[in-house]
Design a protein with these regions (language model features):
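One-carbon transfer enzymes
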Residues: 1-191
Length: 191
């Protein structure tokens, strides 16, 4: 399992561990909340909207995944079948020799990634044949990052969802296995 460290990523790890043995877990430190890597300085309003979105997303995740006592991801019981093989890394170290060595010692049957930066071929080649990515957007329309911001910005909230696809060297480009969109309810906001 290779995930980011945001509450939604930790939640997935906890849910998977309740049904499967997680033999190893690489956690990429994504910071408190993701800021777009592109510079939108030519559009001050877009910059402001992005800042509002990321703050609201962070608060919504905290409220749902941490403050809600029925789902609390900070409880050690939530990760019942996660082995002690856990390594944390930065974006810079995600494709490093230390991560390669860690993965080499695991021998997983399947690999799942969610919420991380791009893995290079040196890491992809170490993973088992059965490897999948959970992408926080509806591919191929919303690839890359901040994929829950853009559908609303483009007035397509029905395109907010997740895609599970085979993990390949092409960014969010492997064959799609499943997609799911959110249920729209009158009065809901983006968060």
């Amino acid at each position: 399992l290779i995930t980011g460290n945001h509450p939604r990523h930790l939640y997935l790890a906890g849910i998977l561990s309740q049904f499967h043995d997680v033999v190893g877990w690489v956690i990429e430190d994504r910071g408190e909340f993701l800021r777009p890597e592109s510079n939108y300085s030519e559009d001050a309003l877009l910059n402001e909207l992005c800042a509002i979105h990321f703050k609201a997303r962070y608060l919504a995740e905290k409220r749902f995944f941490i403050d809600d006592s029925t789902i609390n991801i900070t409880s050690s019981n939530f990760y019942s079948n996660v082995s002690k093989n856990i390594i944390r890394c930065s974006k810079k170290d995600l494709n490093s020799l230390s991560i390669s060595n860690f993965i080499n010692g695991l021998y997983p049957d399947i690999a799942i990634t969610y919420g991380i930066h791009i893995l290079d071929n040196s890491i992809l080649n170490l993973l088992p044949i059965e490897k999948y990515n959970i992408h926080g957007g509806i591919s191929p329309w919303y690839r890359g990052s901040i994929t829950h911001f853009w559908p609303s910005y483009m007035l397509e909230p029905q395109m907010t969802g997740l895609t599970m696809h085979r993990l390949t060297a092409v960014l969010d480009g492997g064959p799609i296995l499943h997609q799911n969109t959110g249920i729209l309810v009158r009065g809901d906001g983006l968060h």
